Amino acid sequence: MLYYVGRFIGWIYLRLLYRVKVHGAENIPARKPFIICSNHINWMDPLTIGTSFPASYRIHFMAKHELFGNIFSSWLFRKVGAFPVNRDNADYSAIKTAYRLLKEGGVLGLFPEGSRSKTGRLQKAYNGAALIAVRSGVPVVPVAITGPYRFCKPVHLYIGVPLVLPPLVYDSKDEKKEQLEEMSMLIMESIGRLPPLSCPERHS
Protein backbone atom coordinates (compact mmCIF):
# COMPACT_ATOMS: atom_id res chain seq x y z
CA MET A 1 0.00 0.00 0.00
CA LEU A 2 2.77 2.45 0.93
CA TYR A 3 4.41 1.88 -2.46
CA TYR A 4 1.28 2.79 -4.41
CA VAL A 5 0.43 5.80 -2.21
CA GLY A 6 3.99 7.09 -2.58
CA ARG A 7 3.91 6.43 -6.31
CA PHE A 8 0.67 8.42 -6.70
CA ILE A 9 2.01 11.38 -4.72
CA GLY A 10 5.30 11.20 -6.62
CA TRP A 11 3.52 11.13 -9.97
CA ILE A 12 1.64 14.36 -9.14
CA TYR A 13 4.74 16.02 -7.67
CA LEU A 14 6.97 15.28 -10.66
CA ARG A 15 4.37 16.21 -13.28
CA LEU A 16 3.47 19.50 -11.63
CA LEU A 17 6.94 20.70 -10.60
CA TYR A 18 9.17 19.19 -13.27
CA ARG A 19 6.75 18.49 -16.13
CA VAL A 20 8.10 14.96 -16.62
CA LYS A 21 7.50 13.70 -20.16
CA VAL A 22 7.80 10.02 -21.11
CA HIS A 23 8.93 8.91 -24.57
CA GLY A 24 8.93 5.35 -25.91
CA ALA A 25 6.34 3.84 -23.58
CA GLU A 26 5.52 1.40 -26.39
CA ASN A 27 8.89 -0.26 -25.70
CA ILE A 28 7.87 -1.39 -22.21
CA PRO A 29 7.70 -5.22 -22.24
CA ALA A 30 4.22 -6.69 -21.98
CA ARG A 31 5.51 -9.32 -19.58
CA LYS A 32 7.77 -9.46 -16.57
CA PRO A 33 10.49 -10.04 -15.49
CA PHE A 34 12.93 -7.53 -16.93
CA ILE A 35 15.69 -5.17 -15.83
CA ILE A 36 15.59 -1.40 -16.23
CA CYS A 37 19.07 0.08 -16.74
CA SER A 38 19.22 3.87 -16.61
CA ASN A 39 21.69 6.71 -16.45
CA HIS A 40 21.77 8.50 -13.10
CA ILE A 41 21.71 12.30 -12.80
CA ASN A 42 19.63 13.05 -9.68
CA TRP A 43 18.51 11.41 -6.45
CA MET A 44 14.93 11.60 -7.77
CA ASP A 45 15.67 9.32 -10.75
CA PRO A 46 14.17 6.21 -9.09
CA LEU A 47 10.93 8.10 -8.45
CA THR A 48 10.89 9.41 -12.02
CA ILE A 49 11.32 5.89 -13.39
CA GLY A 50 8.87 4.34 -10.95
CA THR A 51 6.12 6.77 -11.91
CA SER A 52 6.80 6.43 -15.65
CA PHE A 53 6.20 2.69 -15.86
CA PRO A 54 2.79 1.07 -15.23
CA ALA A 55 1.80 0.88 -11.56
CA SER A 56 1.45 -2.90 -11.90
CA TYR A 57 5.18 -3.09 -12.66
CA ARG A 58 6.48 -2.53 -9.16
CA ILE A 59 10.17 -1.74 -9.58
CA HIS A 60 12.75 -2.95 -7.05
CA PHE A 61 15.76 -0.64 -7.01
CA MET A 62 19.21 -1.60 -5.82
CA ALA A 63 20.25 1.31 -3.57
CA LYS A 64 23.48 2.20 -1.78
CA HIS A 65 23.61 0.64 1.67
CA GLU A 66 24.19 4.02 3.35
CA LEU A 67 20.50 4.80 2.77
CA PHE A 68 19.61 1.93 5.10
CA GLY A 69 21.67 3.36 7.96
CA ASN A 70 18.89 3.72 10.53
CA ILE A 71 15.75 1.80 11.45
CA PHE A 72 13.29 4.26 9.91
CA SER A 73 15.05 4.76 6.57
CA SER A 74 15.72 1.02 6.28
CA TRP A 75 12.03 0.27 6.92
CA LEU A 76 10.90 2.95 4.45
CA PHE A 77 13.19 1.93 1.58
CA ARG A 78 12.37 -1.75 2.00
CA LYS A 79 8.66 -0.95 2.04
CA VAL A 80 8.92 0.72 -1.36
CA GLY A 81 10.81 -2.25 -2.77
CA ALA A 82 14.44 -1.12 -2.55
CA PHE A 83 17.25 -3.30 -1.23
CA PRO A 84 20.82 -2.39 -0.20
CA VAL A 85 24.07 -2.92 -2.05
CA ASN A 86 27.61 -2.24 -0.85
CA ARG A 87 29.25 -0.45 -3.76
CA ASP A 88 32.74 -0.75 -2.28
CA ASN A 89 32.88 -4.53 -2.60
CA ALA A 90 31.40 -7.36 -4.64
CA ASP A 91 28.09 -7.63 -2.78
CA TYR A 92 26.94 -11.18 -3.49
CA SER A 93 24.02 -10.84 -1.09
CA ALA A 94 22.57 -8.01 -3.21
CA ILE A 95 23.14 -10.01 -6.40
CA LYS A 96 21.32 -13.01 -4.89
CA THR A 97 18.42 -10.74 -3.94
CA ALA A 98 18.30 -9.45 -7.52
CA TYR A 99 18.22 -13.00 -8.91
CA ARG A 100 15.43 -13.96 -6.51
CA LEU A 101 13.28 -10.96 -7.44
CA LEU A 102 13.67 -11.70 -11.15
CA LYS A 103 12.94 -15.40 -10.62
CA GLU A 104 9.73 -14.37 -8.85
CA GLY A 105 8.74 -12.34 -11.92
CA GLY A 106 9.75 -8.92 -10.63
CA VAL A 107 11.14 -5.80 -12.28
CA LEU A 108 14.62 -4.70 -11.25
CA GLY A 109 15.87 -1.11 -11.45
CA LEU A 110 19.63 -0.58 -11.81
CA PHE A 111 21.98 2.34 -12.40
CA PRO A 112 24.99 0.63 -14.05
CA GLU A 113 27.23 3.67 -13.48
CA GLY A 114 26.96 3.10 -9.73
CA SER A 115 26.59 6.77 -8.78
CA ARG A 116 25.16 10.03 -10.06
CA SER A 117 26.92 11.78 -12.93
CA LYS A 118 27.90 15.31 -11.93
CA THR A 119 28.16 16.44 -15.56
CA GLY A 120 25.15 14.60 -16.99
CA ARG A 121 27.42 12.65 -19.33
CA LEU A 122 27.40 8.88 -19.31
CA GLN A 123 30.12 7.25 -17.24
CA LYS A 124 31.73 3.84 -17.53
CA ALA A 125 29.50 1.13 -16.08
CA TYR A 126 30.31 -1.40 -13.41
CA ASN A 127 29.82 -5.02 -14.48
CA GLY A 128 27.11 -5.89 -11.96
CA ALA A 129 24.15 -5.05 -14.18
CA ALA A 130 25.56 -7.07 -17.08
CA LEU A 131 26.27 -10.04 -14.80
CA ILE A 132 22.72 -10.06 -13.42
CA ALA A 133 21.21 -9.69 -16.90
CA VAL A 134 23.32 -12.49 -18.39
CA ARG A 135 22.86 -14.93 -15.52
CA SER A 136 19.10 -14.34 -15.28
CA GLY A 137 18.52 -14.29 -19.05
CA VAL A 138 15.91 -11.54 -18.81
CA PRO A 139 15.75 -8.54 -21.17
CA VAL A 140 17.32 -5.19 -20.34
CA VAL A 141 15.19 -2.09 -20.94
CA PRO A 142 17.45 0.94 -21.50
CA VAL A 143 16.26 4.23 -20.02
CA ALA A 144 17.71 7.73 -20.39
CA ILE A 145 16.75 10.67 -18.19
CA THR A 146 17.57 14.25 -19.17
CA GLY A 147 16.67 17.58 -17.64
CA PRO A 148 17.72 19.88 -14.82
CA TYR A 149 15.06 18.94 -12.22
CA ARG A 150 14.26 22.62 -11.79
CA PHE A 151 10.84 24.15 -11.35
CA CYS A 152 8.88 24.08 -14.61
CA LYS A 153 11.95 22.93 -16.57
CA PRO A 154 10.93 19.71 -18.36
CA VAL A 155 12.51 16.40 -17.41
CA HIS A 156 12.41 13.84 -20.23
CA LEU A 157 12.49 10.07 -19.78
CA TYR A 158 13.25 7.95 -22.84
CA ILE A 159 12.53 4.21 -22.94
CA GLY A 160 14.46 2.18 -25.50
CA VAL A 161 13.94 -1.15 -27.22
CA PRO A 162 14.75 -4.07 -24.87
CA LEU A 163 17.89 -6.07 -25.50
CA VAL A 164 18.89 -9.58 -24.44
CA LEU A 165 22.57 -10.12 -23.75
CA PRO A 166 24.30 -13.26 -25.08
CA PRO A 167 25.47 -15.96 -22.65
CA LEU A 168 28.97 -15.93 -21.24
CA VAL A 169 31.44 -18.34 -22.86
CA TYR A 170 34.86 -18.27 -21.23
CA ASP A 171 37.81 -20.41 -20.16
CA SER A 172 39.40 -18.05 -17.66
CA LYS A 173 38.54 -15.27 -15.22
CA ASP A 174 40.16 -12.76 -17.55
CA GLU A 175 37.91 -13.83 -20.42
CA LYS A 176 34.87 -13.62 -18.16
CA LYS A 177 35.81 -10.09 -17.06
CA GLU A 178 36.47 -9.03 -20.65
CA GLN A 179 33.09 -10.32 -21.82
CA LEU A 180 31.25 -8.67 -18.93
CA GLU A 181 32.96 -5.36 -19.71
CA GLU A 182 31.87 -5.69 -23.34
CA MET A 183 28.28 -6.39 -22.29
CA SER A 184 28.36 -3.48 -19.84
CA MET A 185 29.40 -1.28 -22.75
CA LEU A 186 26.51 -2.68 -24.82
CA ILE A 187 24.10 -1.64 -22.07
CA MET A 188 25.57 1.86 -21.88
CA GLU A 189 25.51 2.18 -25.67
CA SER A 190 21.82 1.27 -25.69
CA ILE A 191 21.24 4.06 -23.16
CA GLY A 192 23.49 6.45 -25.10
CA ARG A 193 21.52 5.93 -28.31
CA LEU A 194 18.48 7.48 -26.65
CA PRO A 195 18.33 11.23 -27.38
CA PRO A 196 20.01 13.44 -26.49
CA LEU A 197 22.70 11.42 -24.70
CA SER A 198 25.91 10.09 -26.21
CA CYS A 199 27.70 6.81 -25.61
CA PRO A 200 30.71 6.71 -23.29
CA GLU A 201 33.98 6.22 -25.11
CA ARG A 202 35.26 2.68 -25.50
CA HIS A 203 38.62 1.94 -23.93
CA SER A 204 40.92 -0.59 -25.56
Identify the residue ranges that each predicted region occupies.
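Non-catalytic C-terminal accessory region of glycerolipid acyltransferases
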Residues: A94-S204
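Short, basic, glycine/proline-bearing loop/turn elements
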Residues: G10, K79-P84, P112-S115
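Helix-enriched interaction subdomains in cytosolic or periplasmic regions
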Residues: M1-R7
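Catalytic core of membrane glycerolipid acyltransferases/transacylases, capturing the structured
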Residues: G6, R15, P29-N89
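Glycine-rich, highly charged phosphate/nucleotide-binding loops
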Residues: K21, A90-A94
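A short, basic/flexible loop-to-alpha-helix module at the beginning of a structural domain
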Residues: A25-N27
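Short gly/ser/thr-rich secondary-structure transition/capping motifs
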Residues: R15-H23
